[in-house]
Amino acid sequence: MTNLRKTHPLMKIINSSFIDLPAPSNISSWWNFGSLLGVCLIVQILTGLFLAMHYTSDTMTAFSSVTHICRDVNYGWLIRYLHANGASMFFICLFLHVGRGLYYGSYMFLETWNIGVLLLFAVMATAFMGYVLPWGQMSFWGATVITNLLSAIPYIGSDLVEWIWGGFSVDKATLTRFFAFHFILPFIIAALAGVHLLFLHETGSNNPSGLCSDADKIPFHPYYTIKDILGVLLLILTLTSLVLFSPDLLGDPDNYTPANPLNTPPHIKPEWYFLFAYAILRSIPNKLGGVLALVLSILVLAVIPFLHTSKQRSMMFRPFSQCLFWILVADLLTLTWIGGQPVEHPFIIIGQLASILYFLLILVLMPITSLFENNLLKW
């Protein structure tokens, strides 16, 4: 009798994706983050579902409903903090996943990479709208500042902002629609992740060397299932430690003050995972210029495959490109730090220099260095 997992229409899909999938024998732990992102998404959808059962998307009761979840609902505090810190873990895994793709040249799988960029935008949109829902001071003012950026779009800007707000300011209509979008987007993300995997399995995984691995493949199960389980356990350990020991470490104290349109917080800033983009936005004095730089800071990822000038795919054997990659990482950490600082000297100039360096590295220095390394091969 033939094996059910190889014949049953549903099991066949699971089998070819997670069991009998031929995988390169040399992929390192940097390849774990795809599965970790899947786990993060499941955790976020489940905790979010239970939070939605008790949350009310009304300006009068939103803040107190979150308080009610934390105080009166059984393990509500745990669900709420798992959801809030789960978002941070999601972004840590996302940044490492994208970084891996950049380092090892995974962006050469064009369709997979572009769906990935789309996923990044979708996750960022979801996280932004989720941050508005508790209706604290930072929620309200963050929503006001970020949505207001759209007014920089020529001609239609002001109308567009009022259309998104559902009125003349961030109010009940805005909160209700943000809740609706925040609820539906994770399911769209899950569907996009399925398409992301579909395109990946058309080509097979890349590997650290960047060389073709067709001659040396091993089945995904048991080798990489065991490896992924280790990653999942470490993720759960980190997340639970964060939730149980210092749940507010990555949050903003201002969000424990109910939203007040008449009182502006001294420093309006987003969650830590948006600070690098926020720093780039603030480093340009012009409003439209800042908005364009903000969008391009993420959209630049879509251009990277076309700027690949090296004869080698991975950076494994390219020491100069490796140096630039780690400078880029340091630059992003600097931008993240600057995004959380007030707009004053010396932070303004540091932010501007870091923003210039960010685009310079990706668009100019890395392609030129790759060409230089190609010439080194001839020596």
Curated annotation (Swiss-Prot):
Annotated heme b b562 binding sites: H83, H182
Transmembrane segments: 33-53, 77-98, 113-133, 178-198, 226-246, 288-308, 320-340, 347-367
Co-factor binding details: Binds 2 heme b groups non-covalently.
Main location per the UniProt record: mitochondrion
One GO BP: mitochondrial electron transport, ubiquinol to cytochrome c
Matching CDD domains: cytochrome_b_C (cd00290), Cytochrome_b_N (cd00284)
Cellular-component GO terms for this entry: mitochondrial inner membrane; respiratory chain complex III
Membrane topology: Multi-pass membrane protein
Binding site for heme b b566: H97, H196
Lineage top rank: taxon: Eukaryota
Matches recorded under InterPro entries: Cyt_b/b6_C (IPR005798), Cyt_b/b6_C_sf (IPR036150), Cyt_b/b6_N (IPR005797), Cytb/b6-like_sf (IPR027387), Cytochrome_b (IPR030689), Cytochrome_b_C_euk/bac (IPR048260), Cytochrome_b_N_euk/bac (IPR048259), Di-haem_cyt_TM (IPR016174)
Location of the protein in the cell: Mitochondrion inner membrane
List of residues binding a ubiquinone: H201
Keyword annotations: Electron transport, Heme, Iron, Membrane, Metal-binding, Mitochondrion, Mitochondrion inner membrane, Respiratory chain, Transmembrane, Transmembrane helix, Transport, Ubiquinone
Cofactor: heme b
One Gene Ontology term of the molecular function aspect: ubiquinol-cytochrome-c reductase activity
Misc. remarks from the entry: Heme 1 (or BL or b562) is low-potential and absorbs at about 562 nm, and heme 2 (or BH or b566) is high-potential and absorbs at about 566 nm.
Function: Component of the ubiquinol-cytochrome c reductase complex (complex III or cytochrome b-c1 complex) that is part of the mitochondrial respiratory chain. The b-c1 complex mediates electron transfer from ubiquinol to cytochrome c. Contributes to the generation of a proton gradient across the mitochondrial membrane that is then used for ATP synthesis.
Similarity field: Belongs to the cytochrome b family.
Subunit structure: The cytochrome bc1 complex contains 11 subunits: 3 respiratory subunits (MT-CYB, CYC1 and UQCRFS1), 2 core proteins (UQCRC1 and UQCRC2) and 6 low-molecular weight proteins (UQCRH/QCR6, UQCRB/QCR7, UQCRQ/QCR8, UQCR10/QCR9, UQCR11/QCR10 and a cleavage product of UQCRFS1). This cytochrome bc1 complex then forms a dimer.
Listed name of the protein: Cytochrome b
